[in-house]
Amino acid sequence: RSSDLEGTIVNDEYFGKIPADRLIKENGIIYFKIDGLYRSKLGLPASRATDICGSYDSSKGVLTILWCSLPETPSVYVNGQWGPQEDPFAGDVINSYNDGPVEDGSIMGPFYEIETSSPGAELAPGASLVHTQKVIHVQGKDEQLVPIVQDLFGADLNVIKTKFQ
């Protein structure tokens, strides 16, 4: 959820604009269809990213929860866009990639991924930066997962399940 934050809600142009039937931004929640059938990637900029995100696989009843550490002060992130960039430190904190066929029909997966990035940092010798990411997969019946989704994301699992039908 990112309704109280400012700036671009989601960067959805890594491989061209993500079609509206695959990306919905509604009430502070981003719904991204991740089925391994359409190559696309999105990113959440630092002004919108929170320390938690997740995905739900309704066919297997698996909720994936990803927590990450965020810096206490505003930071810059390496830009993961392909090709030359005007600002190489205008990147995203959280990304999700959905694999799918490329122009020649080949495909690596199908698969999807969710990842987080640490701030881009020029460290002096001996200095360090710690970035922590934790991933938990919870498998269960919908009635068991509903309160978890509500508590962590402020979202209704039943709405999530029907968003792309």
Name each model feature, range by range.
Residues 127-140:
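Short, hydrophobic/aromatic-enriched beta-strand segments in well-ordered soluble domains
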Residues 150-165:
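Short peripheral tails and domain-boundary helices/loops at the edges of structured domains
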Residues 1-128, 147-149:
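A contiguous, surface-exposed recognition patch within enzymatic or periplasmic domains that forms
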Residues 141-152:
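A short acidic/glycine-rich loop-to-helix N-cap element
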